[in-house]
Every structure is written in C-alpha cells, then in structure tokens.
Amino acid sequence: MSFNFPTTDELNEQGFDKQFLSALTHVKKHMDEDSNTPIHFGAFIYFWERYLFAHADRLSENYKGGSWTLENGFWCLDSNDQFDVHTGYGAKYTVNAMEFSIIVNLFALSHMAITTYQQKGNEFINMLSVNFSDYIKLLLDRSLEKLNTEAIYMVTD
C-alpha cells in the first residue's frame, strides 16, 4: 500500500521539529548499513521492536510471527493474512496486515511513551515515541479512503 506522505513543509506545519525529522530520516534508512545510526537512536529502535512483537502477540490470536520491515516511519508486517483484533469493550474487527501493523505500532509507541515519561535519561526515547505516534496518526488522516480507520481507532482507543 502506498501512503500519501507529507512533505517536510507539511510536517513542519504540523509542529514536528528538526530533531524528529532527522530521526524519521534515520528510520527510513534503518535497514541501510551505511546509515550511521546514533547509539541513542539505536536504543529507541531496539525498544520499539521489543514492544512491537509483544503487542502483536497480545493483540491477535491469528498473529503467528512474521517478517517486519522498518520503512516509511513505522514497522510493517509483510503478510497477506487477516488478523482478528478486539477492543477493550468486546467489539471484534478483522484487519489486513497493514492495518494490524499500524495498530501494533501505536500500542508499542504508546507503551514506550508511558514507560519513559519523566524518566531521567529517557527523554529522547519519550520524545521519539510521541512524535512517531503522531506521525503515524498523520499518515492515517491522509489515508482514510485506503484503510479501515474505524477499526484502527476503535482498537487503539
């Protein structure tokens, strides 16, 4: 699926700062051996990935692992499968792999933001968690016709 990605000017208008734009560039190049990812950013990627896998297992019984790639600002599950996900109040939705990826990323980033909130030394990870979550929500707003946004918002609410 292709997203209608915002331009740098549009991201600036949304309040994203240069530090986040630099981090987004690192994420987009993460799989490149020559990206020279800074150590503190590597720690952010490591924890994001750990929380991602834990939440994927918890959110859907259909999820049995798979190949995830970090591109375009978030982790994407490479799968043609459908995933059943439940809201906290009993409703069930069936989503495709892209929608499942977005849901799992939002849960993982939220968990990271809460865990690192006001922890001395983790301000950078907290800031990135919040900004990447906001970035994914911006992509959602720009892809309303392509995704089951009702399911994504209901499950993550």
Give, region by region, the residue ranges found by the protein language model.
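Polybasic, proline/glycine-rich intrinsically disordered low-complexity segments
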Residues: 82-157
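Amphipathic, interaction-prone secondary-structure segments
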Residues: 39-83
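Generic surface-pattern signal
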Residues: 16, 26-32, 57, 61, ...
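Charge-rich, low-complexity N-terminal segments
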Residues: 1-38
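Alpha-helix boundary/N-cap detector
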Residues: 15, 39-47, 54, 90-101
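Charged, low-complexity surface segments at secondary-structure and domain boundaries
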Residues: 3-11, 42, 87-91, 111
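Intrinsically disordered, low-complexity regions
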Residues: 16, 43, 66-67, 74, ...
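A general marker of short, structured functional hotspots
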Residues: 12, 16, 37-42, 59, ...
